[in-house]
């Protein structure tokens, strides 16, 4: 799909101050380094300012301070990255699904599918499911019994919703995601694991995005819950009974153990792991690969582990760890001797 807009139209959409010809046609978006004369770019990160003056972009989204010294066409905005995010949808080449049910789809007689929804090839919609207005269900999706997909939802091909999953409005779910799979629940009887039926469901709020191959398990008793505006990257594991507050975001490969509760407006970087049955308060940032082993009750930034260093240095540090107990004992002995000397006594012989 090809889209063309004028600079004047884009300025109106963004409420931007235009410096340049209103009639200039823009056909797409690109980086400062790669943009051509009919493309729009942006400067959000100062480390890319070095590419600005030589950019061939037809126009650039800039803050007022950067626009003053730039000779090219500009759309002056308060937040160039946010402006880029807003207009990116105008140039999105993703095909638009047509309303209707593909002949190869299997839809239960009592399922409710809005006339404006699109059901792709070989999709399966089971008994009691409800598909809202303007929903797009991709090819080979499975929508289990009694599921609800709210209006404006978009499910990429091969998304699986087990039974009793409720999804809010404008939710995006990428391919391979599995929502409502059975939680990892077992009771041990003399060394033998006995399965616990997972009889809860999953409830997902509005404006949520779930990435490729991410799993959200159903609750053991009550629902696993994902709040409004939550963004989940690819290959994330959300275990049973987890609760995630509104507008929290998680990067790829995060793993959250069962019954953990995460607050609103949190950010978890890639590879973060959380043990089960802990609480994370609102407005917490956790850096990449951190292992969270206890509740966090104060907003702020948290990390664990050691930072990257040259291999030879890391090996030396790792070798010293083996001697920490001995070094601690020797330090205690030295502290005792120092205390004795500074207090006017005589040091005792400790071998």
Curated annotation (Swiss-Prot):
Pathway: Bacterial outer membrane biogenesis; LPS lipid A biosynthesis. Belongs to the transferase hexapeptide repeat family. LpxD subfamily. The keyword Disulfide bond does not apply. GO terms for molecular function: N-acyltransferase activity. The keyword Lipid metabolism applies. This is UDP-3-O-acylglucosamine N-acyltransferase. NCBIfam families: lipid_A_lpxD, PRK00892.1. InterPro entries: Hexapep, Hexapep_transf_CS, LpxD, Trimer_LpxA-like_sf, UDP_GlcNAc_AcTrfase_non-rep. Catalyzes the N-acylation of UDP-3-O-acylglucosamine using 3-hydroxyacyl-ACP as the acyl donor. Is involved in the biosynthesis of lipid A, a phosphorylated glycolipid that anchors the lipopolysaccharide to the outer membrane of the cell. It comes from Pseudomonas putida (strain ATCC 47054 / DSM 6125 / CFBP 8728 / NCIMB 11950 / KT2440). Pfam families: Hexapep, LpxD. One of its GO terms (biological process) is lipid A biosynthetic process.
